[in-house]
Amino acid sequence: MSTTISTQRGQVYIGELPQDFLRITPTQQQQQVQLDAQAAQQLQYGGSLGTVGRLSITVVQAKLAKNYGMTRMDPYCRVRLGYAVYETPTAHNGAKNPRWNKVIQCTVPPGVDSFYLEIFDERAFSMDDRIAWTHVTIPEGLREGSVVDEWYSLSLSGRQGDDKEGMINLVMSYANMPAGMHMSPPVVLMPTVYQQGVGYVPIAGVPTVYNQGMVPMGMPAAPTVAPQEAPCSEEDLKALQDMFPNLDKEVIRTVIEAQQGNKDAAINSLLQMTEEL
């Protein structure tokens, strides 16, 4: 119940404030970023438990119906399977006929029989534009050892219409994963995500996963020895710190160690981080 009291400046209304008082309603893009961050954290903290096999997806090329925008598009693919999210490199100036030839190794959780594929146009000064998407059902014949090489239709409502956005060529194979098999770890980065009702908030101290077509970590049934990480030299650390003064020293060290001392790969990962900040 609301009440009114008098102060030196006049009457003041006192009552229960609505739950959305002084809160910013997140956009669809912000909600998508939040969902991606949650999915990545699920993968990092046990999302790959109970995996039963490994699916190899080769994203070969696409034939799109239209080039959106004034310049040639820079398309890339995003694949979501279970809690894991994978991305191909960007096909710069790929326009309507991008080629990736990117092999993505995915762990398949129990009960998962399909994955969601999206094609984005990478933008330099705005949010990436989603131009096509489709659900792909994992063929049953893969579990019997066959290899599937097919073109899949892309649907995009609101522009060209359903199943009119073009085709994408995927090559898929499947392999059973023995118990205790250890897959390569993903790159661990510090996330900055949109939180509902708060706005753009960096979350410190909680690692998430960035998958650029990389292999997620399979949780082994029996204890296994973690792979030896390459030492991070102070010279490389200082050089990268000079290149990325806005990033924390420990974050840079973590990226270098995750890339096993590969300086060029670490620079690419750090560039991706700065683009998202």
Curated annotation (Swiss-Prot):
Residues 232-275 form the CUE domain. CDD domains: C2_Tollip, CUE_TOLIP. GO terms for molecular function: ubiquitin binding; ubiquitin conjugating enzyme binding. A motif (AIM1) lies at residues 133-136. Pfam families: C2, CUE. A motif (AIM2) lies at residues 151-154. Residues 35-152 form the C2 domain. Gene3D superfamilies: C2 domain (2.60.40.150), DNA helicase RuvA subunit, C-terminal domain (1.10.8.10). Ubiquitous. GO terms for cellular component: cytoplasm. Keywords: Autophagy, Cytoplasm, Immunity, Inflammatory response, Innate immunity, Repeat. Both ATG8-interaction motifs (AIM1 and AIM2) are required for the association with ATG8 family proteins. Interacts with ATG8 family proteins (via AIM motifs), and ubiquitin (via CUE domain). PANTHER family: TOLL-INTERACTING PROTEIN. Belongs to the tollip family. This is Toll-interacting protein A. It comes from Oncorhynchus mykiss.
